[in-house]
Regions:
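Glycine-biased, small-residue-rich flexible motifs in mid-sequence functional cores and linkers
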Residues: 219-408
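Short catalytic/metal-binding and nucleic-acid-binding patches
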Residues: 1-232, 236, 241
Length: 408
């Protein structure tokens, strides 16, 4: 029987209200493959573990960074490891229980009919049951006519249901352990699976670094510079060779950028995190690789790296493969840089991979002129590249071709 227009409207309304990160991808087969799952505790309560150890201690040593599970956290780990008992087509690969969230990596074998949502939902229910046991809620004997606030009494009114809400954060038995929904990431290659395993393994160390140097991971929002104005941004687009020849494309590009820029009550603003001393440095150089200079890239790379090794801070959006090649070297040689980001920062944003450690070791600033926009796969348009490159020029106070004209 087809859905009525009213039912379709209700479904669409619920889907629109759901956070982007929790929406499922209609093109993904959730019945087979690798999945990296993240669950958050209700109200982000840090009740599953504590982080102990010292940064830099070798793995396996008593003082190595690790998560010390609470009794509830240990039960969560136990429930995760018993998933194959109920879903034989599922293989458990790795997991870590952080104070306020859970990471797990699993593999769903081809040919199975189980949906990932069913597997995760069963795991969440089992964890909530353990949580209720911890709280002393007699959930095994409860039923809808006997809410936890009125066991054994007269048939309750709807208002008597203490643990009921529209988002299913609670049931009539008690509060849930995890908030509704989960974030899933689908690693495709074995290399990506290995990256996720390493990410899980280093969670405790990352948290210790973040906790010890929290100022470096704090996002400073809506900051201003007298040189960073809307007219500067729009002129950077208008000066582009392509847009000079196409008035309509120029206006469309400028409007697109206006929609993405970070505005506050005063003007366009900047958000950033990391070692703010790098932003105040007088020794900054822009890195912008142009196709016209492709044959001279090795020369440009050599001069940029020489400058960085001599105390200069590289400023770049690291858009092109050549720019990213230099970024990789900067990271490997522990050299400082300022990275212009192609998206805004979410509330819980932090750098990932080697950039996380660069930030923790005061070697990096990430700065954004954009509003945050959730995208599974980000595509950078021409006008965004122009804006980010202009910001790198403003920060460094040097033109693109400085490396052709001077030696440092």
């Amino acid at each position: 029987m087809p859905l009525s227009p009213e039912q379709i409207a209700i479904i669409r309304k619920k889907e629109a209200a759901k956070p982007d990160v929790l929406k499922r991808d209609n093109l993904t087969n959730y019945r087979e493959g690798y999945f990296f799952i993240t669950l958050n505790t209700r109200n982000e309560s840090p009740i599953l573990s504590t982080i102990e150890g010292e940064v830099g201690m070798p793995a396996g040593s008593p003082n190595a960074p690790h998560c010390k599970y609470t009794p509830l956290g240990a039960k969560v780990k136990e429930m995760w490891e018993t998933i194959p008992n109920f879903h034989p087509t599922v293989t458990i690969i790795a997991a870590e229980i952080m104070p306020e969230h859970f990471h797990g990596l699993l593999f769903m074998k081809p040919g199975g009919n189980e949906h990932l949502g069913k597997v995760v939902n069963g795991f969440m229910i089992a964890c909530t049951h353990e949580y209720w046991d911890t709280l002393g809620i007699p959930w095994r004997n409860a039923h809808p006519s006997q809410p936890s606030s009125n066991f054994g009494g007269a048939p309750p009114k709807k208002s008597d249901y203490k643990y009921t809400d529209r988002d299913h954060t609670y049931s009539f038995r008690g509060p849930s352990l995890f908030v509704r929904g989960y974030n899933d990431v689908v690693p495709i290659t074995q290399g990506e699976v290995d990256i996720k395993i390493e990410y899980i393994r280093r969670q405790a160390e990352r948290r210790l670094i973040k906790g010890e140097k929290s100022d470096l991971f704090k996002i400073y929002r809506n900051k201003h510079s007298k040189n960073w104005r809307e007219d500067v941004v729009l002129n950077a687009i208008a000066a582009d060779r392509f847009f000079k020849q196409n008035e309509k494309a120029k206006k469309d590009a400028q409007q697109n950028v206006r929609l993405r820029l970070n505005y506050d009550s005063q003007s366009i603003a900047l958000d950033y995190l990391g070692n703010l001393e790098l932003l105040a440095s007088e020794k900054t150089i822009p890195l912008i690789c142009h196709r016209a200079d492709a044959k001279r890239f090795e020369e440009q790379k050599s001069i940029v790296l020489q400058a960085a090794r001599n105390g200069w801070t590289v400023v770049s959006a690291f858009i092109s493969p050549k720019e990213r090649e230099i970024r990789k070297i900067l990271l490997s040689e522990l050299l400082p840089f300022i990275e212009i980001m192609d998206n805004g920062f979410s509330d819980r944003y932090k750098p990932t991979g080697t950039a996380f450690y660069a930030c923790g070791e005061r070697r990096m600033v990430q700065i954004s002129c954009w509003n945050y926009k959730y995208e599974r796969e980000s595509v950078i348009c021409r006008e965004m590249c122009l804006v980010m490159n202009e910001l790198s020029r403003i920060i460094s106070k040097l033109p693109d071709d400085w490396w052709k004209q001077m030696k440092i």
